[in-house]
Regions:
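ABC ATPase NBD Q-loop/coupling interface
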Residues: 65-82
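Conserved ABC ATPase "signature" region
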Residues: 119-137
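Conserved ABC ATPase signature
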Residues: 142-146, 150
Length: 288
């Protein structure tokens, strides 16, 4: 499968040449494939935020290259703005970046900067607002009059409105209650299924990653530590613990059962999958 984004021996050093020099990413290489739902996870300081800021050209590599559709994004610095239209980045707590008088103006900011017609801008604004579960009633409201969860949705809609080929979200559920978290994740699943765009979810929550990502990349110390399907990654529970990460609670239970001789897959990562295996062992009969 051809990657839509390729990271080739990426290195990034902050404050290079000063006493405060720090390498955040060290010779990192990875691929992101067209149409996949990718999860990126890592402990604080693993290089997650630095990596994703390179993917749409917000940071320039100290060394190495970033390819988008086979083209080095920094081959012509004058075109880096076009890269940012194709690779949309939603920062953590994106609602803090809302600034316009109305929701309509805020969501239309990106498409307007793309030089689109008013008709196309209007189409994109309404489609994106609907995609995040809001209706036209909010369009003329001040974004600052909305609830916290609604503000987050509007901020995400503003990036979706550019219709990027790749949508990257940094901790999109941070600070939300469980219902709010699931609402955001559900809209991302729906967006991915309907648009066929590549979605990259950066999270500290193993449960979020396990239940949504088709593939996972684990970062540690500024480089790729593990990658694979959720089952492949969570099979390495002990290795994950050594880099300060945990596995989903259901995987912990499966590991404990497996160690006690119960023939279940220790890498199972959803409640439904573990329940199915346990019911099969009981001959399909549910037990209270």
């Amino acid at each position: 499968m051809e990657p839509i984004i390729r990271v080739d021996h990426l290195t990034h050093t902050y404050s290079a040449g000063t006493p405060f020099q720090r390498s955040a990413v060290k010779d990192m290489s990875l691929d992101i494939y067209r149409g996949e739902f990718l999860g990126i996870i890592g402990h604080t300081g693993s290089g997650k935020s630095t990596l994703i800021q390179h993917l749409n050209g917000l940071l320039k590599p100290t060394g190495g290259r970033i390819f988008l559709n086979g083209q080095d994004i920094w081959a012509d610095p004058k075109k880096i703005r076009q890269v940012r239209f194709q690779v949309g980045l939603v920062f953590q707590y994106p609602e803090y970046q809302l600034f316009e008088e109305t929701v309509y103006k805020d969501v239309s900011f990106g498409p307007r900067n793309m030089g689109l017609s008013e008709k196309e801008i209007d189409r994109r604004v309404r489609a994106s607002v609907h995609a995040v579960g809001l209706n036209d009633d909010v369009l003329e409201k001040s974004p600052f009059a909305l609830s916290g969860g609604q503000k987050r949705r509007v901020a995400i809609a503003g990036v979706m409105a550019m219709e990027p080929k790749v949508l990257i979200l940094d901790e999109p559920t941070a600070g939300l209650d469980p219902r709010g978290c699931e609402d955001i994740l559900a809209l991302l699943r729906s967006y991915h299924a309907q648009r066929g765009s590549t979605v990259v979810l950066v999270s500290h929550s193993m449960e979020e990653i396990a239940c949504n990502a088709q593939r996972i990349i684990v970062l540690s110390g500024g480089d790729v530590y593990l990658q694979g399907t959720p089952g492949e990654v969570f099979a390495h529970a002990r290795q994950l613990e050594t880099v300060g990460l945990d596995v989903p609670q259901v995987t912990k239970i499966a590991h404990a059962l497996h160690e006690k001789g119960v023939p279940v897959d220790p890498a199972v990562y959803t409640v439904e999958a573990l329940q199915k295996q346990l019911l099969a062992l009981k001959g399909g009969r549910a037990v209270c």
